[in-house]
Amino acid sequence: MLREALRKAAAGEPLSEGEAERALETIMEGGASPEATAALLTALRVRGESVQEIVGFARAMRRFAARVRAPEGVVDTCGTGGDAKGTINVSTAAAFVARGAGVVIAKHGNRAATSRAGSADVLEALGAAIELSPEQVSRCIEEAGIGFMFARTHHPAMRHVAPVRAELPFRTVFNLLGPLTNPAGARRQLVGVFSAGYVRPMAEALEGLGAERALVVHGRDGMDEITVTGPTLVAEVGGGGVEEYEISPEDFGLSRHAPDGLLGGDAHLNARILRDVLSGEERGASRDVIVLNAGAAIYVAGKAPSIEEGVRLAEGSLESGAALAALERFVRVSRRLAGRGA
């Protein structure tokens, strides 16, 4: 099967969803050489991955994932990463603000690849236990209302791909698959992407994979989040189609900020900024971008009828202390489940 997929990809022909799915199954079963895997990923990158190929790859990767139990309506705020902007960990912080507003979160994430601090790095710096088993994550979601699924732990078959990805000097389809392969099966998502060109394709892929409601976003400043420096492109999935529009911070009563106000650093600095926002000590650009993204997550969860109402609930989560309490409970529960004490 992989040989035929390679032939078609090398000829510039698109793979069907089923062909892409079977090709990745072969790779993740260890049935492909590193050279064949690299050739396929390179050919797809040169031509540009189609929505059908992305969906097929995601279906295969989901099948090999270590599953996590979570209630209906659970939300993920995992993005693609890779915007190389050096900003704070917005989606990680937004997850705790949304949790403080009553949203159940199954956060999928990893260590940094192109930035200095990924979600796993920051959560670890905050004191959380991040390398929990699928059963432990399921219990964490049940007890704390939020769980973190470390990609390396929950996608063990990626060991057949990781060395090849490390050798290739460019992004591949796998940079898109993280948000599409949540091990808890989240069907409500806020997904940031690193390029405006992927906003609609990712939304169409999510629709093809059965998303109930999702927002795919890309800041005009290049952020893979909803930005507060200017407009953000949005593709919304839900209601039987994909709707594209643009939003700005002023639409939600928030200020526009200079890009420098969103800069972070290593995991420890980003963890400190996250905690400062959640505790109410930081009220500038960092707070506003976290509130806006949390508001979008609250809307995606169905807890608010609009992003604007979601932003109001996000502000309430911060002001009441619920967001900080959500972080502290997550750290405490994750450590106990990992056997590290409270």
UniProtKB/Swiss-Prot annotation:
Amino-acid positions noted as binding Mg(2+) 2 in the UniProt annotation, renumbered to this chain: 224-225
Q: Give the pathway.
A: Amino-acid biosynthesis; L-tryptophan biosynthesis; L-tryptophan from chorismate: step 2/5
Residues binding anthranilate 1 are 79, 110
InterPro entries from the entry? Anthranilate_Pribosyl_Tfrase, Glycosyl_Trfase_fam3, Glycosyl_Trfase_fam3_N_dom, Glycosyl_Trfase_fam3_N_dom_sf, Nuc_phospho_transferase
Quote one Gene Ontology molecular function term.
Answer: magnesium ion binding
Q: Where does anthranilate 2 bind?
A: 165
Which amino acids does the record list as binding 5-phospho-alpha-D-ribose 1-diphosphate? 79, 82-83, 87, 89-92, 107-115, 119
What are the entry keywords? Amino-acid biosynthesis, Aromatic amino acid biosynthesis, Glycosyltransferase, Magnesium, Metal-binding, Transferase, Tryptophan biosynthesis
Q: How is the cofactor bound?
A: Binds 2 magnesium ions per monomer.
What's a GO biological-process term for it? Answer: L-tryptophan biosynthetic process
Any GO CC annotation of this UniProt entry: cytosol
Which cofactor does the UniProt annotation name? Mg(2+)
Which reaction equation describes what this protein catalyses?
A: N-(5-phospho-beta-D-ribosyl)anthranilate + diphosphate = 5-phospho-alpha-D-ribose 1-diphosphate + anthranilate
Q: What's a Pfam family in this record?
A: Glycos_trans_3N
Binding residues for Mg(2+) 1, per the UniProt record? Answer: 91, 225
User: What Enzyme Commission number(s) does the record list for this chain?
Assistant: 2.4.2.18
Q: Which family does it belong to?
A: Belongs to the anthranilate phosphoribosyltransferase family.
Described purpose of this protein according to its UniProt entry: Catalyzes the transfer of the phosphoribosyl group of 5-phosphorylribose-1-pyrophosphate (PRPP) to anthranilate to yield N-(5'-phosphoribosyl)-anthranilate (PRA).
What the entry lists under PANTHER family is as follows: ANTHRANILATE PHOSPHORIBOSYLTRANSFERASE
Assembly state and interactors? Homodimer.
Q: What is this protein called?
A: Anthranilate phosphoribosyltransferase
Name its species.
Rubrobacter xylanophilus (strain DSM 9941 / JCM 11954 / NBRC 16129 / PRD-1)
Q: What is the lineage of its organism?
A: Bacteria, Bacillati, Actinomycetota, Rubrobacteria, Rubrobacterales
